[in-house]
Amino acid sequence: MERAEFHLSFVGDSVIGERANCEAGAMIANYRNEREDKRIRIRIGDVVVDTGVEKFGALVGDDARIGANAAIAPGAVIHARTIVPRLSLVDQGA
């Protein structure tokens, strides 16, 4: 993750692209305590991929920007050059 910048945030067990930026207070959660089945799944288009693990954050693409106090759910995919507005929730619900 060359030159990625993350300011006072929680980033749990995630894959972060180059030059990604995360403003203060943003959270990338890595555990789904609200579900019976804790395994993390990732939705890519119409395909759901089971990671086989209970702790996995998000896939954050190159040059993505995550605004202050945004909440990113486990298994979320933030594509390259995506801008997540401040106070947003990103949850693909896979």
Annotate each predicted stretch with a short phrase.
Residues 1-94:
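Glycine-rich hexapeptide-repeat left-handed beta-helix
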